[in-house]
């Protein structure tokens, strides 16, 4: 073998070796890439499976929430219907409003207190409504039932009590039936109409009844000192229920117009939407 051949041989041998090494590296890279692709595919499939499972869970929770809300609203509609029938029957039999509250108070207390669940519904997010607004509305009703009418028995026969009872009853039957049919995706037009029109009269009548009832309670509260805390005491605090009721009555002045005009805006929004839909058709 000549010197040139030897040199040529030395050159050819590394090239062959490099070629084999290159092939080996390519194979390794291919295997790594395939392994990586398989891993990515596995991860992707796992993520897709997790998303699907999460979506299924949300769907099940949504169905469960809808089922519970449907049951709740049906129960509340039935409860207030029972109250309405009891009030009509009492008046037809007795011919007077005296004794009416006493005859229905247990049913009223149960269903009005049961409405506290509406605050829970807002807290856990199954109803997209403000917790604060719902809490104020529910607590004001419970306040009227337990801390005014129930606690001050001499005012139970006041005509103002009948005013807010009738207003509440018609309003709640309409409201809960509206929610029920909406959840069932079958809302009759007359229920929708009642929901957005009856409040125009019922809301002011109900507020008037509440204010007049609180006003009628003031002399009894002042005379008895009920729910009041006087000084001196070990906690060094005082509370006068009489003045608390005066402040409560005064709070209706700014709050009532805000809520009432908000409801009027909602009514215009809904009715305006219906007009546009009819024109488009």
Swiss-Prot record:
Record organism: Mus musculus
GO molecular function terms attached to this record: enzyme binding; very-long-chain (3R)-3-hydroxyacyl-CoA dehydratase activity
Protein EC: 4.2.1.134
Any one annotated GO CC term: endoplasmic reticulum
Catalytic activity as recorded in UniProt: a very-long-chain (3R)-3-hydroxyacyl-CoA = a very-long-chain (2E)-enoyl-CoA + H2O; (3R)-hydroxyhexadecanoyl-CoA = (2E)-hexadecenoyl-CoA + H2O; (3R)-hydroxyoctadecanoyl-CoA = (2E)-octadecenoyl-CoA + H2O; (3R)-hydroxyeicosanoyl-CoA = (2E)-eicosenoyl-CoA + H2O
Residues the record marks as active site: 203, 210
Membrane-spanning residues: 69-88, 108-124, 135-152, 159-173, 197-214, 245-262
Protein name: Very-long-chain (3R)-3-hydroxyacyl-CoA dehydratase 1
Localisation per UniProt entry: Endoplasmic reticulum membrane
Oligomeric form and interacting partners: May interact with enzymes of the ELO family (including ELOVL1); with those enzymes that mediate condensation, the first of the four steps of the reaction cycle responsible for fatty acids elongation, may be part of a larger fatty acids elongase complex. Interacts with TECR.
Annotated membrane topology: Multi-pass membrane protein
Modification after translation: N-glycosylated.
Free-text tissue specificity from the UniProt record: Expressed at high levels in heart, skeletal muscle and testis, weak expression in kidney and liver.
